[in-house]
């Protein structure tokens, strides 16, 4: 299941990565703050739609264990960075298949977040409890949680079918993230962070 989703979304994934600040830019206060603000606004629109999609409870995935929006909110507060004034419209996530596809994007970002965390923690003085909660993700359990997500998606598709609809949901979420990051003002320079003491 995960390889099929990776293949279906490869082009969008590459374009999103190209739009995001580089690792070196993220290790600078303004770049890190801008990325947090952009991701916070995206999750604020997409997470509620994913978790409230009709039939999503049947996936067995637990919202309280996987929501990233509270982590992003905590990071912004800890670093004294205001959320973006720009907002995304609520997306249309019509069913569990589309929600699984979108969650593939949101959960997959956790893997990349671990790489970012290791690169920026020292230069920025962030920790999992001060400004780095989102990028720290599930910590040492990140790989295990990713595999568990993949197994839940595979199991759901084996019962309900609709692998093509899951892939379409992932493509839709990636396309929305791509469009959001390309929106003027979304990744503009943010106020500098207060370095951890």
Q: In which residue ranges do the predicted regions lie?
A:
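Metal- and O2-centered redox machinery and metal/ROS homeostasis
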Residues: 1-197
């Amino acid at each position: 299941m995960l390889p099929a989703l990776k293949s279906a979304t490869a082009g969008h994934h590459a374009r999103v990565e190209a739009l995001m600040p580089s690792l070196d830019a993220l290790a600078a206060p303004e770049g890190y703050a801008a990325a947090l603000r952009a991701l916070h606004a995206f999750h604020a629109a997409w997470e509620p739609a994913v978790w409230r999609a009709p039939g999503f409870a049947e996936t067995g995935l637990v919202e309280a264990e996987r929501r990233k929006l509270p982590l992003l909110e905590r990071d912004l507060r800890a670093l004294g960075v205001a959320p973006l004034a720009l907002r995304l419209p609520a997306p249309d996530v019509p069913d569990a298949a589309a929600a699984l596809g979108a969650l593939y994007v949101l959960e997959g970002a956790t893997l990349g977040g671990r790489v970012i965390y290791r690169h920026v923690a020292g230069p920025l003085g962030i920790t999992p409890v001060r400004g780095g909660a989102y990028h720290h993700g599930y910590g040492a359990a990140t790989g295990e949680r990713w595999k568990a997500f993949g197994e839940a998606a595979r199991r759901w598709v084996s019962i309900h079918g609709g692998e093509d609809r899951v892939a379409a949901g992932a493509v839709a979420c990636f396309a929305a993230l791509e469009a959001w990051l390309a929106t003027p003002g979304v990744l503009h320079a943010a106020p500098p962070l207060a370095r951890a003491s």
